[in-house]
Amino acid sequence: ITAATATLAARMLTGQHYPIVCVPTDYETEGLWPHKAADLFCVANESMAETLRPRKVPEESILITGIPTRDDFRRAYDRPSVREQLKLPQDRRIVLALAGAYLPRPYVHFRTALDKLLPYLHGFDDTLHFVFVAGSDADYARHLRQECEELGLANATVLDYVDDMAALMAASDLAICKSGGLTVTECLCAQVPMILLGKAYGQEKVNVQMLTSLGAAMHVTTARELLDTLRHVAKYPESARAMLINGSFLRHPNAAEDIANATLRLIAAPKNPGDPRYRKHLLHFYWGKKPAHIR
């Protein structure tokens, strides 16, 4: 939001002729950053394009690309080989819990729900194996390992920071994660179904609504709901496969490449000196139409 606004202001004040491309990383068009003077909006889906049109963004400035991810999320992985490298069982469905974060505060409730889940994991011994990714949080990793050891869990693995997350996701059958735009997009591209854990607000709430309305994810807010959902998925594996199929509607594995190509085309295109977007001016005010979506 800050970058888009500041960059547009700089171009207005200086009159320089450089293209501005906005790439939102959630499934919602926020109210503060869209500005019709931007040259291109690369959005995740048609719903986002629909919110830009009342803001008088011209159709030629809207491109539905999906949300970009790293290139390794486009690769095909040998699941048995990845599992062997990580010492994960071949005969169980892998449930990946993404609990690591640079800022642990947003994950407090998420981790609390996982802690409450741990004593019940014995009930999935014959079906599911759980992989908890603690990231760079050594204290949390130590806590998880101690809990798993005290509970005698044979179907749980705790990992620290994982360099090749795309490979781990591709080797998994289900992910438990928060509803951040980049996280859910990586899961979509890695073709791993999702259980979105925790209450969601702002853009993340829209991410939840988008994914669950399409049947591409399940949403739970408490440890009890999480346990019930896992029992359902363990009993009916077809439900996870259905999420995978429905998620293909939102999957854009080539988004980063498409955005880069669109940006290069803008750079190469001749600039019209008379274009009001490139004229030096102090401010610009315009009044849009009725919003497509209200929240």
What do the PLM-derived regions correspond to, one by one?
Residues 237-295:
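C-terminal amphipathic helix plus adjacent low-complexity
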